[in-house]
Every structure is written in structure tokens, then in C-alpha cells.
A protein has these predicted regions:
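Hydrophobic transmembrane alpha-helices of secondary-active solute transporters
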Residues: 12, 54-63, 90, 94, ...
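A late C-terminal transmembrane helix in Major Facilitator Superfamily
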Residues: 162-200, 207
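Symmetry-related core transmembrane helices of the 12-TM Major Facilitator Superfamily/SLC fold
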Residues: 1-18, 203-220
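Juxtamembrane intracellular "pre-TM" segments in multi-pass secondary transporters
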Residues: 20-54
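C-terminal transmembrane helical hairpin of 12-TM major facilitator-type secondary transporters
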Residues: 109-157
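Helix-loop junctions on the cytosolic side of multi-pass membrane transporters
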Residues: 16-30, 219-229
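Extracytoplasmic gate region of multi-pass secondary transporters
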Residues: 46-98
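Helix-to-loop junctions at the C-terminal end of transmembrane segments
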Residues: 97-110, 195-196
């Protein structure tokens, strides 16, 4: 039998099909660019390399925190509800900071936002390491702030990359949101093995140093205004 949720999904899909504006048949087809040429242009662009590095650092903290910490909390005897709530706070904080990111960029500029996002993660992770055993509520607040801080620069990085190579906007988005995160995901099995032998919290604190060190390359980034600005 079809469940109620499936019926709701079918209804919503039908509404989207009939209500979302269709692409005009008179619209000129987009100019197709050579696939390998676009990859070469992106990977050979130094500014794009720096931006992809920043995106990888964001993914490094996000993925390692969301994957490794549940095992730590489970070993400490925390309930599944506590673990799920902690992850919800982290993801919600990231979504909220992504929403505020454009406003922060207009107020402070692109570079200060990226600097803050990459440098502030390390001291917050140290505070989390000092409180997660004895002050569970306070550690959740700090974990929320880690999620907020880590993801604050993600939209800025995305827009910055698209402004760098506006002719490859969609492919650039794939690199920032897909390729960079995929590279980090491939490393997670190795990080998991290291964490099992050395300790999860030690690994997370050490990993949080990497974005702070990588923030050195932010100074080489050049500001690029949007065409509509």
C-alpha cells in the first residue's frame, strides 16, 4: 500500500510540474563549452585553487565532527536522542550562518568573513575538548558555535569562486560543493582509523588547526565584484 507520505510527495511533485514556469522554447540554447577545457581552466586558476582549499577545510571540520563525534558520545553513554539533538544543532547552526553569510560579507567584506571562519574554529574546538566530559550542556552550545563558524564562509566561498570564473558558474559550483567535499570524504576512512588509535578528540583538535594554518592563503585572494553590483 502507498503510504500517506508518498501521496503527499506525489501531490507536491504534481504541483511543481504544473506551477513551475517552463523554459521558453524561443530561448537560445546555452553555448556549450569544451568539457576538458573548462576543467583545465578551473584547475589552472590559482585563485580557484585557494578557494577550493578553503572549501576543503570547511568540509574537513564539518564531516569529521558529524562522523566521529557520535562514536565518542555513544562511548560516553549518551542517549541516541542526545546525539541526534547535538547533530541537529550543528547542522541548524550551519544553515543559519549560511543565511547570514551574505549580510556579514556586505558588512565586513569577504576576506574578514573567511578569516574569522577559518581561525575561530580552533579555539572553539579546544573549548569543546575541555568541556564535553564535565559540562555537557555548555559543550553543546560550543558545538553549535563551531557549526555556525565553520559554515559561515561557505556561501562566500561559492560566490567568490563563481565571480572568479563567471563563464563556468555551474561547473565551479560542482567543484566547490562536490569535488572538494568528495576529496575530504575519501580521507575520512584514514582519519577514522587514526581516531580509533589515537583518540577522537585529539584528532578533531589537530584537524581544527589545519584551517587556521590554511587561512594564510586568504591574503592572496583578489576581490571580484558581481556584474550586477
Amino acid at each position: 500500500m502507498i503510504s500517506y507520505t508518498s501521496l503527499i510527495g506525489l501531490v507536491l511533485a504534481s504541483v511543481m510540474f504544473f506551477c513551475v514556469p517552463k523554459l521558453s522554447k524561443l530561448e537560445k540554447p546555452p553555448v556549450k563549452k569544451e568539457f576538458f577545457k573548462s576543467f583545465k581552466d578551473i584547475l589552472s586558476n590559482r585563485q580557484m585553487n585557494y578557494l577550493m582549499l578553503i572549501s576543503m577545510m570547511k568540509s574537513l571540520i564539518t564531516n569529521s565532527s558529524c562522523i566521529l563525534l557520535p562514536f565518542l558520545w555513544k562511548a560516553m553513554g549518551h542517549s541516541p536522542f542526545y546525539i541526534g539533538f547535538a547533530l541537529f544543532l550543528f547542522v541548524f547552526a550551519g544553515a543559519f550562518s549560511s543565511f547570514l553569510s551574505p549580510k556579514a560579507e556586505k558588512l565586513f567584506g569577504s576576506k574578514p568573513v573567511v578569516y574569522f571562519s577559518m581561525l575561530a574554529t580552533f579555539p572553539m574546538m579546544v573549548l569543546f575538548a575541555l568541556t564535553y566530559k564535565t559540562h555537557s550542556v555548555l559543550s553543546l552550545v560550543i558545538f553549535f558555535l563551531i557549526g555556525f563558524t565553520t559554515m559561515l564562509a561557505q556561501p562566500v566561498t561559492m560566490v567568490w569562486a563563481q565571480r572568479t570564473l563567471p563563464e563556468y558558474k555551474s561547473i565551479v559550483a560542482g567543484f566547490i560543493n562536490g569535488f572538494c567535499w568528495g576529496i575530504v570524504a575519501l580521507c575520512m576512512s584514514i582519519l577514522g582509523a587514526v581516531a580509533q588509535n589515537c583518540g577522537i578528540m585529539k584528532v578533531l583538535v589537530l584537524l581544527s588547526i589545519v584551517p587556521a594554518i590554511s587561512s594564510y592563503f586568504v591574503k592572496f585572494l583578489k576581490e571580484k565584484k558581481n556584474e550586477s553590483d
